[in-house]
């Protein structure tokens, strides 16, 4: 859509609204494209010379392989033949360089999907492969940025070949070359290649690190070259600085090589060098680096050095749950067996644990604990895994010290990063059985706090990753411990997980909590009503936040174990949340939960909220006012349903507290400024809910105060921010409607004449304000007035609104006020009803229907534009909607008030708008057009060419026709050119579309389907 033709204002949407989460996944059963891939690989020899064809075939292969990123195991049966086809090209000495590199590119794409560790095993590793692969690597240019896939795959291939069980010296033969010069031994050639590629900046560096880890651990290489290689890496580390790009690249390669080496090397081989490497690593001070990858590699190396220092043995003291079968876990007999196994394991002699722990371990553990507080997740995650691995090799006392140090991460003086890292580490310990049952009582409070950790920091919040980690910790506990160990904490953990699954702000946390709850239900079998809750709050159900708050929560609260914890969480943690959307959802959830615990709401929650509603904290005050409104309304509805007094659940103190909210805020001038943008709609909502609750405040002075607030809010709209205006306006209008219906009507169903005259006159006078927003507010306010307030003043109100819809030089850009005036006219018509022979001061009748239609039809031609674009589109859209509402109202009551001329004008203008170039307005016009055409209870009279229209737009296609698609809409619209009544208007609309900047409408709009003489008949 062209810039000049966009919907200038669009719809006003809340920026903080949670984005819709759509989970789309490909659940595949096999590698269905195997034949297509075979054909692609077979065509490489024919297309490599054409760059365009080469790019096409590569992109096709990438698209196919990317489908299997989440299910790469489906490729396993096909990897061998794919590799063989590509290796045939690579081994062919006649393959041109372009084809050679293209084959390696395809190998890399496969490796990227399946992972190099598995793909590595498939490489041929015969003795005869060593020399050719070495020669191919030597022929490569390490600086060629176009062929990095070739170098990466060759190094991986070499890392597999170098595992051949023969002394490399046998490959050297005659060490003298033909020219008489000494030739470099094969061992040194491979090492030089590895060293060369450890200092490059591309992907080959990763493969070089893998090569080093496989090559250096060979017995012959270890004896002759390991010490020298480690000296070289430590020297390179010492000379490099992470403050330069070159130094960062070098350090990355060295750290990868060392980490891989200490992972794959034997402990007895690496132990003599571990202390030296650790000392060098300390001197590098990687914790001060801004490079996340360097800090992560440093953490990985530190933990592997720590594992080298301690013996590779499983701790005898670790907690062993025993049977892992889900079915057995739920059987009482199995539980007894497991308890016996645990007792035996706990009583085993610990004679093997008496060994000295090197002093370096303290340094290693300290660095890992510091790593848990790193600012980046991948560093914390690496540190957490290191803590788990090393703790499993420590004696029981030292391991308990590590757990104690971990628990220090969970003080509120620590950052959210420390909490997150601590949760990950505790989960690792629990998963490995290293967190003994004696520590569960210390860890459970941490879980409960972490599951609700949410803090605002600047313009965003922190804590979502922490809550996610807490769910992982709960999941790990479910798998690690016998149900009997967690029995004392079951209610706390289950309630916390339910609350996180239903009320968390972030969808990933809700889903993580749901998964953790499911794991606990399956593994523990002790969560109250676990299966029932899982059915309602499964992984997919919790994806929709509104559904969680308003529907799922009500179902779960039906189980008494969860009712009060859920209510308390909303009151304590959510109504004061930094996100206004969460606050509003929480108050609506409280409304829905009130029938589950009405006495608790009335006697505990409401008295707790009333002081908060006039407190000092803005967010708490906002949420508390809304919560008071929703809970009060719910209690009154419940009392009414049970045939009790409206005030059954309220005492005098509560009623007085509700009345005092507005007076207190007004006296403290809290309606001013940015805070007022929250307070005004909140108190208006309170007014609306108290009015709907029929509170006994009739004649009370508070009613005047509420009316003042509504009027002042509408007058203050120009001062509100753009984001808040709509909400303030809607809240005030809704409050006005409810207030009038409850407190301004007497026993005879009429209004006090003085009050009516003052209110209506005041609102009509505001319609001529020089501020557009004031016109908008009071237009909608007039539209919201009940029938008894409009009685005797209808013509005056309609005339005032008609003037707002007129375009004058002074207010040509007041599109929003014209839109809202049209909306108000339609609302008023529906409020007062239709009576053909009635008074024009009370009903829509024959005396004023023509004037109403004239006002609405006049606005269908509003094409005002300004810097925001086609703002007149808002007016046209509102006019079309109002025309539809008024017409259907008349048709259903007194259809004779609609004459043929009016109906023709309506349908013709709608037909013109259906040829609109802006998709949104075209779709709306088309929808209104078809609604009037196919309405049949009773049908709209006097529609020109009804039979032809029903043939062009069959009733069966009314809902499926996509008006947003120009290619679908215009072929239908152009057929109206054959109908004389519509020709001029449709051609006018098509002309605008053809001349517009939008390519699709310009192409689709020409009347190709209208017949050869359609245009001629017009003239």
Curated annotation (Swiss-Prot):
GO cellular component terms, semicolon-separated: adherens junction; bicellular tight junction; centrosome; cytoplasm; lateral plasma membrane
Gene3D superfamilies: Leucine-rich Repeat Variant (1.25.10.10)
InterPro entries per record: ARM-like, ARM-type_fold, TBCD, Tubulin_specific_chaperoneD_C
Any one GO MF annotation of this record: GTPase activator activity
Pfam families linked: ARM_TBCD, TFCD_C
Chain positions of HEAT repeats: 364-402, 856-898
Gene Ontology annotations of biological process type: adherens junction assembly; bicellular tight junction assembly; microtubule cytoskeleton organization; negative regulation of cell-substrate adhesion; negative regulation of microtubule polymerization; post-chaperonin tubulin folding pathway; protein folding; tubulin complex assembly
Record function comment: Tubulin-folding protein implicated in the first step of the tubulin folding pathway and required for tubulin complex assembly. Involved in the regulation of microtubule polymerization or depolymerization, it modulates microtubule dynamics by capturing GTP-bound beta-tubulin (TUBB). Its ability to interact with beta tubulin is regulated via its interaction with ARL2. Acts as a GTPase-activating protein (GAP) for ARL2. Induces microtubule disruption in absence of ARL2. Increases degradation of beta tubulin, when overexpressed in polarized cells.
Stated family: Belongs to the TBCD family.
Name of the molecule in the record: Tubulin-specific chaperone D
Species the sequence originates in: Gallus gallus (Chicken)
Lineage, opening ranks: Eukaryota, Metazoa, Chordata, Craniata, Vertebrata
């Amino acid at each position: 859509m062209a810039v000049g033709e966009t919907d200038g204002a669009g719809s006003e949407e809340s920026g903080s609204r949670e984005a819709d989460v759509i989970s789309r996944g490909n659940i595949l059963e096999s590698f269905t494209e195997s034949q297509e891939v075979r054909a692609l690989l077979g065509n490489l020899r024919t297309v490599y010379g054409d760059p365009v064809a080469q790019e096409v075939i590569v992109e096709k292969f990438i698209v196919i392989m990317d489908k299997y990123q989440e299910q790469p195991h489906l490729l396993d049966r096909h990897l061998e033949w794919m590799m063989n086809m590509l290796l045939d090209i690579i081994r062919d000495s006649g393959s041109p360089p372009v084809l050679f590199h293209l084959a390696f590119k395809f190998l890399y794409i496969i490796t990227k999907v399946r992972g190099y560790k598995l793909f590595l095993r498939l490489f041929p590793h015969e003795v005869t492969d060593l020399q050719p692969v070495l020669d191919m690597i030597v022929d490569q240019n390490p600086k060629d940025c176009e062929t990095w896939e070739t170098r990466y795959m060759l190094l991986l291939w070499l890392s597999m070949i170098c595992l051949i069980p023969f002394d490399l010296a046998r490959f050297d033969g005659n060490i003298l070359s033909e020219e008489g010069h000494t030739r470099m031994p094969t061992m040194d050639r491979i090492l030089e290649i590895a060293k060369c590629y450890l200092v490059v900046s591309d992907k080959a560096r990763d493969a070089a690190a893998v090569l080093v880890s496989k090559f250096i651990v060979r017995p012959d290489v270890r004896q002759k070259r390991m010490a020298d290689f480690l000296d070289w890496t430590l020297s390179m580390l010492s000379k490099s600085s992470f403050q330069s790009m070159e130094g960062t690249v070098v350090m990355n390669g060295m750290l990868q090589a060392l980490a891989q080496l200490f992972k794959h090397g034997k402990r007895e081989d690496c132990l003599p060098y571990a202390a030296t490497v650790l000392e060098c690593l300390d001197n590098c001070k990687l914790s001060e680096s801004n490079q996340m990858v360097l800090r992560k590699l440093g953490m990985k190396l530190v933990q592997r050095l720590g594992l080298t220092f301690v013996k590779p043995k499983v701790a005898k003291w670790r907690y062993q749950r025993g049977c892992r079968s889900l079915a057995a876990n739920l059987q009482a007999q199995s539980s007894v067996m497991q308890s016996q196994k645990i007792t035996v394991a706990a009583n085993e002699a610990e004679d093997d644990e008496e060994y000295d722990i090197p002093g370096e371990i303290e340094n290693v553990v300290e660095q890992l604990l510091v790593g848990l507080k790193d600012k980046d997740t991948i560093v914390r995650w690496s540190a957490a895994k290191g803590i788990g691995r090393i703790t499993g090799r420590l004696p029981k006392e030292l391991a308990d010290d590590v757990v104690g140090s971990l628990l220090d991460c969970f003080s509120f003086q620590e950052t959210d990063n420390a909490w997150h890292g601590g949760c990950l580490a505790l989960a690792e310990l629990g998963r490995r059985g290293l967190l003994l049952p004696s520590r569960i009582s210390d860890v459970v409070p941490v879980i409960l706090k972490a599951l609700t950790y949410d803090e605002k920091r600047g313009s965003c919040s922190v804590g979502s990753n922490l809550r996610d980690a807490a769910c992982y910790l709960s999941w790990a506990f479910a798998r690690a411990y016998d149900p009997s160990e967690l029995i004392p904490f079951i209610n706390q953990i289950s309630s916390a997980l339910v609350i996180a699954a239903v009320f968390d702000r972030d969808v990933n946390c809700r889903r993580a909590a749901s998964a953790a709850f499911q794991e606990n239900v399956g593994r523990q079998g002790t969560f109250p009503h676990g299966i029932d809750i899982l059915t309602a709050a499964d992984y997919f159900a919790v994806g929709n936040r509104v559904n969680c708050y308003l529907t799922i929560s009500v179902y779960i609260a039906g189980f008494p174990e969860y009712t009060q914890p859920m209510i308390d969480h909303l009151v304590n943690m959510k109504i004061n949340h930094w996100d206004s959307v969460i606050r509003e959802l929480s108050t609506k959830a409280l409304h829905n939960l009130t029938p589950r615990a009405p006495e608790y709401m009335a006697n505990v929650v409401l008295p707790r909220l009333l002081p908060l509603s006039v407190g000092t904290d803005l967010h708490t005050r906002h949420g508390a006012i809304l919560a008071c409104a929703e809970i009060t309304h719910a209690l009154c509805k419940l009392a009414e349903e049970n045939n009790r007094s409206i005030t059954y659940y309220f005492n005098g103190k509560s009623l007085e507290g509700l009345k005092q909210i507005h007076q207190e805020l007004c006296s403290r001038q809290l309606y001013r400024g940015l805070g007022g943008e929250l307070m005004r709609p909140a108190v208006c909502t309170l007014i609306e809910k108290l009015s709907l609750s029929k509170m006994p405040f009739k004649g009370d002075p508070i009613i005047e105060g509420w009316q003042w607030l509504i009027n002042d809010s509408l007058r203050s709209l120009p001062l509100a921010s753009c984001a808040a205006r709509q909400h303030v306006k809607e809240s005030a209008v809704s409050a006005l409607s409810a207030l009038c219906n409850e407190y301004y009507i007497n026993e005879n169903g009429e209004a006090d004449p003085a009050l009516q005259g003052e209110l209506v006159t005041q609102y009509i006078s505001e319609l001529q304000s020089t501020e557009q927003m004031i016109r908008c507010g009071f237009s909608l306010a007039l539209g919201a007035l009940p029938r008894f307030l409009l009685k005797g003043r209808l013509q005056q109100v309609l005339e005032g609104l008609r003037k707002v819809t007129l375009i004058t030089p002074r207010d040509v850009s007041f599109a929003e006020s014209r839109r809202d005036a049209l909306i108000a006219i339609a609302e008023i018509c529906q409020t007062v009803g239709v009576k053909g022979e009635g008074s024009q001061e009370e009903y829509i009748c024959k005396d004023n229907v023509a004037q109403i239609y004239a006002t609405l039809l006049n606005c269908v031609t509003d094409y005002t534009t300004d810097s925001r674009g086609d703002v007149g589109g808002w007016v046209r859209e509102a006019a079309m909607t109002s025309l539809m509402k008024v017409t259907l109202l008349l048709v259903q009551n007194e259809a004779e008030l609609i004459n043929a001329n009016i109906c023709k004008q309506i349908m013709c203008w709608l037909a013109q708008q259906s040829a609109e170039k802006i998709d949104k307005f075209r779709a709306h016009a088309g929808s209104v057009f078809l609604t009037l055409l196919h309405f049949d209870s009773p049908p709209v009279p006097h529609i020109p060419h009804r039979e032809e229209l029903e043939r062009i737009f069959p009733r069966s296609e009314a809902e499926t026709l996509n008006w947003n698609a120009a290619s679908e809409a215009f072929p239908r619209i152009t057929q109206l050119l054959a109908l004389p009544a519509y020709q001029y208007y449709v051609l006018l609309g098509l002309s605008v579309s053809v001349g517009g900047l939008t390519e699709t409408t310009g192409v689709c709009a020409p009347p190709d389907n209208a017949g050869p003489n359609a245009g001629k008949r017009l003239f």
